[in-house]
C-alpha cells in the first residue's frame, strides 16, 4: 500500500507541481482558521464580560472578522484548486492507464474476465488517485486543526481532552474496517455489474434491436438486467446498513461526550472555576476537536479505501507484457523461404482442452495456403498464433528459420495485413475506417481511395453525402441534426466487409496476407467479385485463406484440412478431390446444395 501511495504522489507531483504548492499553502491556512476563530472568540467574550476598553476590543473584533472571511473564502479557493488538480491528474492517469493496456501485445488479458474487472476498477480509481493526494493534505489539515484545538482544550480540562481523544480510537478501527469492506465489495460485485451493463447495452443497441423485437425478448433481457441490478443493490444495502449501525453508534458516543463536557463546563462556570470566555472556548474546542477527529478518522479511512482501489490502477500500469520478448530481439528478415509450424500445441489455459494438437504446417513464400475445416477445428486459433496474439505451449513457429517468439510482436505484425471475419466497424468517417489500417498514411486521401477501389467500395464511399468525410454511424449527431441525412449513414453488412478489405489493402504490400472468411455475408455476385479482387491482391504474395465456402479456396496453391486441432489432409484441390477424403466429402456436400433439393432432416 505504501507503493501505491508513492505512485499517486509521483503522478501528482509530475502533473501540477506549482498548483500543488499553492494548494498546500491554502490548506495550511485553512487548517489554522478554526483555531484562530476559537481563541479570538474567547478573547472578545472575556473582554466584553470584563468591560475592557474599546481600543483593545476593536482589533480583536477586526481580527475575528478577517478570520471569518478567510474561513468562508478559503474552502472555495481550495475547492477550485482541487478541481483543477483532479482534472489534470485524471488526464495523466487515463493516458498512462491506456498506454499500459497497449503494452499487452497479445489477446490473453482481454479475454480474461478477471482482467476486465481489474481494468474497470482501475478506470473508476482514476479519481481515487487524486483523492489520495487531496485526502493526504486533508488529513494533514485535520491533524493541524486537531492539534491546535486539543491544545486549547487542554488548557481548560486535560481529563475531558483525553476522553474526547479516546473516542477516536474505536472510530478509526471501525472506519478502516468499513473501508476494506467497501473496496472488497467493489471487486465482489464486478461480475454482477458487468452482466447488468451487458443486458442494458443489448436493450439500447441497434445491433440487437431487430432480434429483440422479432423474438419479443425485450422483457426477458430487461428482467435479467433488473435482477442483476437488484443483486448489486442488495449488496450495497447490506453495506449501508452496516455503516449505519457503526457510524450511528460512534455518533451517539461523541454526542454523549460533548453533552457531558457541556454540563461540566456550566457547573464549573457557575462555581467560578471557568470564565464565560472559557466556556465559549470549551464549547467551540470540543465541537472542533470532535469535528477534526471525525474528519481525520474519515479521511484516513477514505484514504485507505482509495489506496486499495488505486492499487488496481497500479497493478495494470506496472504489469509487463503478456508475451515475453528477449532483451535482444531478433530482426525479422523479409520472407523469402516460408513460415513453418513445427509440432505446435495450444490451449487457452490449463483448464481448457487442447485446441491445436501437434500441428506441422509449412507456408511457402509467395504461395497461397488455405485452411479449411468444421467450426471449432482450430482454424482461427492457428491464425492467432501466426499473428502472435498467443504463444504455443509446445512447438515453434518460424519465419525463414527465425522463431517468432524471438521477435518483437510489433515488428512481426508490421509485415502482416489481413481481414478478419469479426472485423471492426468503427463509428468514424469513411476515410478513417480505411486509413486505420496504416495510420502513418492516414492523410493520404489518394491512397485511401486507391485501396477502396481495389476493394470495390470507392464508388459507394465517394457518393456518400460528405464523401469520405461522412460518418459511418448515427451515434454522434446533435439534437438539431437528428433528421439531417448528411450527418451519418449506416452501411450494409456487405459494404462494411468491403470497407474492411480496403483497410487491409491500405497497408500496401506486406509479406503475409491473412484472409479470414473475406466473403462471409456477401451475396453470390459480390462474393465472386471480392474473391477475384483478393486473388489479384495476393497474386505472387504469401497468403493464408480461411473459409467455410470451399469453392473460394479451390485455386489456392495448397489446402490444409483441420479436424479437432490436427491436420488430417493436405494437398491441392484436385489432389484432395481425387483422394475422396474429408475435403472431397465437404466440397461435394456444399455443391449438392446448388444442384439438388435439400433433404429433410429427421430428428
Kindly label every feature range from the protein language model.
Residues 1-34, 54-60, 111-147, 195, ...:
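Membrane-integrated ABC transporters
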Residues 17-74, 150-182, 256-267, 271-277:
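Transmembrane helix-loop-helix hairpins at lipid-water interfaces of multipass membrane proteins
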Residues 396-398, 431-485, 540:
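ABC ATPase nucleotide-binding domain helical subdomain, centered on the C-loop/LSGGQ "ABC signature"
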Residues 466-469, 532, 540, 545-603:
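C-terminal portion of ABC ATPase nucleotide-binding domains
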Residues 13-14, 121-132, 191, 204, ...:
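An intracellular "coupling" helix at the cytosolic face of ABC transporter transmembrane type-1 domains
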Residues 387:
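Helix-to-loop junction immediately C-terminal to a conserved catalytic motif
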Residues 119, 458-499, 505, 511-515, ...:
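ABC-fold ATPase nucleotide-binding domain signature/coupling loops
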Residues 217, 285-318:
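Cytosolic ends of transmembrane helices, especially the final helix of ABC transmembrane type-1 domains
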